[in-house]
UniProtKB/Swiss-Prot annotation:
It is found in: Cytoplasm. GO terms for biological process: DNA replication. GO terms for cellular component: cytoplasm. It catalyses: DNA(n) + a 2'-deoxyribonucleoside 5'-triphosphate = DNA(n+1) + diphosphate. This is DNA polymerase III subunit alpha. Belongs to the DNA polymerase type-C family. DnaE subfamily. Its EC number is 2.7.7.7. One of its GO terms (molecular function) is DNA-directed DNA polymerase activity. InterPro entries: DNA_pol3_alpha_NTPase_dom, DNA_pol3_alpha_thumb_dom, DNA_pol3_finger, DnaE2/DnaE/PolC, DNAPol_HHH, PHP_dom, Pol/His_phosphatase_N, Pol/histidinol_Pase-like.
């Protein structure tokens, strides 16, 4: 036996063979090094997802990485054929750069053209792209071994032909790869492997093909076998107890040492040596880029010459065309800038052009300019800017951004630092609805294979892995759920703690003692925990990055990254994740979908329809006091970035009065500034509570906009430049160092700063103190460029809410249409603004929320928002589109008319039911109860009508030749069942709309809740004095029960409705138990304390009382912040009432001998109690009765004037 000098693993699956390979790459690299091996290959199933991760990790450990994949190959000449279901495995390895690019191409085509259950290539494609590639016959699923293995019954059944066919196929591969095709032999102790073993050796002798010894490695250590089996079960949705599931018959698929392999293949030591031969042949060195030594190649703009010629210009290169467009763009921008400042702008522009040109980024800027230009030309809303790009005047001149960097003191160096080589990063916000159009434009512009979105890998993180493993081990759902809930809800939490940069980061095991108790007391929980520890952070599945796009204008992307086809989007995606794209010389562009831009666009369209005007945001008065009054009031629901409770409180405290204040609010509204005291300093100095002082007079122009407080990163840079004498480029490097908190770098820079200050004539000690202050606040400093750009959207939305609140709130509601809970929340806000929302109805509603004018009782036009049909839960877009298109020919006059006109191939029973429940079909002649009981009958009639109309069209009928054709008339045979009671109607409305329309659930308890005094209304909670007590009355709509992360005890979040809106209370274990003793179907009284957390007023629950107990309590008067408030009658928000709804018309029952005088009294009372419910008179005459509709609209309070009479809610 020859001495085994070396061995290389050439058949290895990492974590990128998703939920099949369980080799975590970094652990794998250390193990390979530990075993003394000098090289190792990766052969993931059908993909190259992990190639660069593998390459860099192995290089870091001093191991030679061999890049490969285990391809799936079929024998049809048509790559995309679905006729051939049979596929085989084949291992491929990149010898050199040519082989690497061929491998990336093959992997790309396998997904983009050959995918059928698996990513496949064929021999035709392989022949064309085999240069620089080594191949081996793979495992038992390889084509050669498949035909050899006639011992396997399944193989025989599906066409395994034996040795001769196997030899013929091996020779085909030999012809393709010549000396670079090897026969692979494995010895895992599997019977089928033993059967083919001697045949492979025989074939080697007959053909001259060399043999390599491999171990089909799926996990790192022998004891990882069971965990890998669990991972396979997760992938297949199986449990360990499922019979017939796919599993390995032996536990030999780990990283074996050279010694173990030598022992296994003692009879053919050359098979081990040949693995090293392959390793020696593979000389691939991937040219990986980095910012410091080997920067990425800046992209070029493919269309410079064509664009220039189209404009009658003669520019051949990106740089000259870019400079021209920037200068021309600035001329347009300067129209709004005072003339005395023009030189300043021109100088700044030339400086930026020079830096961008020297750094070779004109092509990048032109690519961004082009897609934003296209978006604006197509009417696709684009944000005013995002991130540090807003600090560039060039970006402003090119209309990439819409914020003037000089006006707001934004720094170009924050975007591009000439003293630090780094790629530019311009992120762009687009209308969420139309973002896809920009991606389609890029694909059309640069080519199908030159543009791709970016892959992401979802990992088995702490909570998720516990749930996955528990399911595989058949742990009961409740136990698994409780176990997972013990994992603390912290960002980046791990199951166990770990060391990082000399610091121990605690994990769930250290933070939650109950985990240890459970694991040590429960054997099944112990198994779940151990397997979870093994599988934690393993890649689970592939996804698509929400924003990133890569573009190569010169070559197809597969020259730099293999490509993948996303099942979710159908689009092309990189196989390499974000982290590895810049190293392979690709630059990403972020295309973000921003919902607020869609809201603004919808609002502007409604405004144009309603008012026949176009709002020009670029000419808004940025000092408009009415807009600032809206923000100061805290009434900021719907206003971009500042609508949360925390921001509402901050706005009230800070009372912004300038655009600079809005920029600051966005920067300050984060946990760091809130906790550091920055916010208090800012507010107190703005309002004169504290004096504004500057350590150096030179700081005043820098810190004046923020009242002497350091808020922005740009201010840090300017201070370092102005006081310490640094360049802005150096100042940016210091800013970055401060963020990293490197003590040595900070100390060195402090000395340099103090020395620089002295050289400029400043006091050294004062400079040292200033440095310490900068360091303190630098950690909380925000990017002003980003804050300023987003403040622009904040101002725009505040402007719309101030001047066009109906249109703006209608657009807001539309944006939330697919989330019923959000619609309900915004409806409450709309009501608080005293805007009426008309309920949905097929004769008045559009797809989206809309604005329309209705006549009030005085005959005046009154603007209202109309509920969109698209916001009704469960209806769907197709039936709504059909209903609205048909309605354009005239309103629906009856249910029969509706059925005869609507297409019932689109309107199904599932869609019709929520339309009925929501009240959208009221006034078509039948009650909701009747329609709901006859849904099948209605749908049958609709389908029969569709069929009859189809038969009557064209040449299919005697009637087809008649002009205009004919329509099948619908006749319904339905018995009137009357209407549901009020409670059922309200429940149906809440189910489909998320709100109550025809009344309030408390209406039925009017008598029980009479007489209570000093109760606080939900709309007044924020007006109460902090620390005071309050009693509120309401009905619990829902209690969401949860388990505390630390305590492990149950708690609940209760949604409670009163007559004026909703409020929320947290219920702890004791209160949850108390609730079980109470009837939650009835109103309850809640004793609370008013508290404030992070600027948000909250209720802390003390006690829950039923109405009987509450009557025995002397409820004290609530204490308001404004004493005058207690004297006011606070506005009530009434429930939304139905629009001319048969379910909410109000009728008074009278005898036929009623006197005219009494009728006059009714009319007077009706005018006093005007509302939205049609008033009917029901006149009784012996055994008959007649219903008369008046022209009066009333509210519920009219009943109080005629208590002795019978009243009916008409359906």
């Amino acid at each position: 036996m020859k001495e085994n000098k070396a061995f290389t693993h050439l058949h290895l699956h990492t974590e990128y063979s998703l939920l099949d390979g369980a080799n975590k790459i970094k652990i794998l690299a250390k193990r390979v090094k530990e075993l003394g091996m000098k090289s190792v290959s990766v052969t993931d199933h059908g993909n190259m997802f992990g190639a660069i991760d593998f390459y860099t990790s192995m290089k870091k450990e001093g191991i030679k990485p061999i890049i490969g994949m285990e391809a799936y190959i079929h024998n049809d000449d048509n790559l995309s054929s679905k006729e051939t279901k049979q596929r085989f495995h084949l291992c491929l390895f990149a010898k050199n750069q040519e082989g690497y690019e061929n491998l990336m191409f093959l992997s790309s085509m396998a997904y983009l053209e050959g995918f059928y259950y698996f990513p496949r290539i064929n021999k035709k494609l392989l022949k064309e792209h085999s240069k620089g590639i080594i191949a081996s016959s793979a495992c038992l699923q390889g084509e050669v071994n498949y035909h050899l293995n006639t011992n396997n019954e399944r193989n025989r059944k599906y066409g395994a032909k034996g040795y001769d066919e196997a030899k013929k196929i091996a020779c085909e591969y030999q012809e393709i790869f010549e000396d670079d095709f090897y026969l692979e032999i494995m010895r895992h102790g599997i019977l089928d492997q033993r059967f083919i073993d001697e045949q492979v050796i025989k074939m080697s002798l007959e053909t001259g093909l060399k043999i390599i010894a491999t171990n089909d490695t799926h996990y790192t250590m022998p004891n990882d076998a069971k965990a890998q089996e669990v991972a396979m079960c997760v992938a297949m949705g199986k449990t360990l107890n499922d019979k017939g599931r796919l599993k390995h018959s032996v536990h030999e698929f780990y990283i074996k040492s050279p010694e173990e392999m030598a022992k296994l293949f003692a009879d053919i030591p050359e098979a081990l040596e040949n693995t090293q031969e392959i390793a020696d042949k593979c000389v691939l060195e991937i040219d990986l880029k980095d910012d410091k030594k080997n920067p990425p190649t800046p992209p070029s703009f493919k269309f410079t010459k064509a664009y220039a010629q189209n404009e009658g210009l003669n520019f051949e290169d990106d740089a000259s065309y870019f400079a021209y467009k920037a200068r021309e763009g600035l001329k347009e921008r300067l129209v709004l800038v005072p003339k005395e400042k023009h030189d300043q702008y021109k100088e700044r522009l030339e400086k930026e052009i020079e830096v961008i040109t020297n750094m070779k980024f004109p092509g990048y800027m032109l690519i961004v300019w082009d897609f934003i230009r296209y978006a604006k030309e197509m009417g696709i809303p684009v944000g005013p800017g995002r991130g540090s790009a807003a600090g560039s005047l060039v970006a402003f001149a090119l209309k990439i951004t819409d914020i003037d960097p000089l006006k707001y003191d934004l720094l170009f160096e924050r975007f591009l630092n000439p003293e630090r080589i780094s790629m530019p990063d311009i992120d762009t916000d687009f209308c969420q609805r139309r973002r896809k159009e920009i991606i389609e434009y890029m694909i059309e512009k640069y080519g199908k294979y030159n543009v791709a979105q970016v892959i992401t890998f979802n990992k088995m993180l702490a909570k998720g892995v516990i749930r996955d493993v528990a399911r595989v081990l058949d742990m009961p759902y409740k136990e698994a759920d409780d176990f997972a809930k013990l994992i603390p809800n912290r960002l980046g939490i791990t199951l166990k703690g770990y060391e990082k940069n000399g610091e121990f980061i605690e994990g769930a095991w250290e933070l939650e003692p109950k985990i240890k108790e459970l694991v040590e007391s429960n054997e099944l929980a112990k198994q779940v925990w151990e397997y979870s520890l093994n599988l934690e952070n393993l890649n689970r599945n592939a996804g698509v990055h929400a924003a990133a796009l890569v573009v190569d204008s010169q070559k197809e992307l597969w020259h730099k990254t293999p490509l993948f086809a996303s099942e979710k989007t159908g689009g092309i995606v990189t196989q390499y994740s974000m982290k590895y794209l810049e190293p392979v010389d690709l630059i990403k562009f972020d295309f973000l979908g921003l919902k607020t831009l869609t809201v603004i666009d919808d609002a502007l369209k409604i405004i144009k329809t309603q008012h026949k005007i176009s709002v020009d945001f670029l000419s808004l008065d940025m000092d408009d006091p009415k807009v600032y009054k809206t923000i100061q009031s805290g009434d900021t629901v719907g206003i971009f970035q500042i609508e949360s409770g925390m921001f509402q409180g901050l706005n009230k405290r800070l009372r912004p009065s300038s655009f600079e204040d809005i920029i600051a609010i966005i920067a300050l509204g984060r946990p760091g500034p809130m906790e550091s005291g920055m916010v208090d300093d800012f507010v107190n100095r703005k309002h004169g509570v504290e004096p504004i002082a500057y350590a150096f007079k030179e700081l005043e122009p820098i810190l004046k906009p923020t009242y002497g407080t350091i808020v922005y990163q740009e201010q840090v840079m300017q201070i370092v430049q102005t006081i310490g004498g640094f360049s802005l480029g150096e100042a940016d490097l210091i800013r970055r160092a401060m963020g990293k908190k490197d003590a040595q770098i900070m100390a060195d820079n402090k000395a340099k700063f103090v020395e620089g200050a002295k050289n400029l004539g400043h006091d050294g000690q004062k400079a040292a103190n200033l440095w310490d202050l900068i360091v303190k606040f630098a950690g909380y400093g925000f990017n002003k460029s980003h804050s300023a750009a987003y403040a622009m959207i904040t101002f725009q939305t505040a402007y719309l809410k101030t001047y066009y609140k109906h249109e703006f709130m209608a657009a807001m509601l539309t944006s939330e249409s697919n989330k019923i809970e959000s619609v309900a929340r915004y409806i409450d806000e709309v009501r608080a603004l005293e805007i009426e929302v008309m309920p949905p109805h097929i004769n008045s509603s559009m797809q989206d929320f809309s604005v329309a004018e209705f006549k009030n009782q005085k005959g005046e036009l009154e603007k209202k928002i109309v509920f969109g049909l698209g916001a009704i839960k469960g209806v769907g877009g197709e039936p709504i589109k059909n209903i609205i298109e048909e309605r354009a020919k005239g309103d629906y006059k009856s249910l029969e008319d509706f059925i005869s006109r609507v297409d019932f191939s689109k309107l199904t029973k599932k869609s019709l039911e929520p339309l009925v429940k929501s009240g959208s079909l009221d006034n078509l002649g039948y009650t909701r109860k009747t329609m709901l009981a006859n849904l099948d009958l209605i749908c049958d009639a609709g389908r029969a009508k569709d069929k009859a109309n189809e038969m009557m069209q064209g040449g299919n009928s005697l009637f087809g030749a008649m002009e205009g054709g004919t329509k099948e008339q619908v006749v319904l045979d339905m018995i009137d069942l009357g209407e549901h009671d009020a409670k059922t109607l309200l429940e149906c409305e809440y189910e489909t709309l998320g709100i109550h329309v025809s009344g309030n659930p408390l209406d039925e308890f009017k008598e029980e809740i009479k007489g209570f005094k000093n109760l606080v209304k939900s709309i007044d909670i924020e007006e109460l004095e902090i620390g005071s007590q309050a009693y509120l009355l309401g009905k619990i709509m829902e209690v969401k029960k949860k388990i505390g992360k630390r305590s492990g005890k149950p708690y609940g979040i209760a949604d409670i409705l009163d007559r004026y809106g909703k409020f929320e209370l947290m219920l702890f274990e004791k209160q949850l138990n108390a609730l079980e003793e109470l009837d939650i179907n009835k109103p309850l009284v809640f004793k609370c304390k008013i508290e404030e957390q992070e600027e948000v007023v909250r209720l802390r629950l003390f006690e829950i009382l039923d109405l009987e107990s509450a009557r025995e309590v002397k409820i004290p008067k609530a204490r308001y912040k404004d004493p005058e408030k207690q004297k006011e009658e606070v506005r009530e928000i009434p429930p939304m009432e139905m629009l001319a709804s048969s379910s909410c018309s109000l009728a008074i029952v009278l005898e036929n001998d009623v006197k005219k005088e009494f009728l006059r009294q009714i009319k007077e009372s009706a005018l006093k109690h005007q509302g939205k419910r049609p008033l009917y008179l029901i006149i009784k005459d012996k055994d008959k009765q007649f219903k008369i509709q008046s022209d009066l609209m009333v509210n519920e309070k009219i009943k109080d004037d005629f208590k002795g009479l019978e009243w009916r809610d008409l359906a």
